[in-house]
Amino acid sequence: MKRAGNILAALQLALVVGHASAAEPPAVSVAQLAGSTLSAVAFVPRTAGMPGGGELARIMLQAYLAPDGRAVVRVWDTGRAAYTAPAERRWSLSGSTFCLDVPLAGPRPICADIHIWGPRIAGVGAKPYAMLDGDLQRGNVLGVH
């Protein structure tokens, strides 16, 4: 037990030192998202009617983020082993909080405080909890509008 406590203390120290010395990533802008396709995995609280078990549901998605706030979104349907038909939804960015309406995610959009590094995008949100991890590719790789 003492060894585990020492390891935990060392990890906490590394986290504090790393956080203090790490530069903040640049602010996220709409220009980084608009006109791109997001391919990502999101973890959200499981709601009634969602397949699977456990507290969190994993949603694999692709979304073309149009410059006007529209999004064309498709989600991987594990039961069919195929993507759902693309559906028109909405997306927004307020500060660093990115929100995307996603089929199968329940009545609320997935919202996360995001960071973007090159093609990578990742973030975590609260109320409700959400985790997003994926990449961005310029253009509409879904091929639908």
Regions inferred by a protein language model and the residue ranges of each:
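Bacterial N-terminal signal peptides
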Residues: 8-18
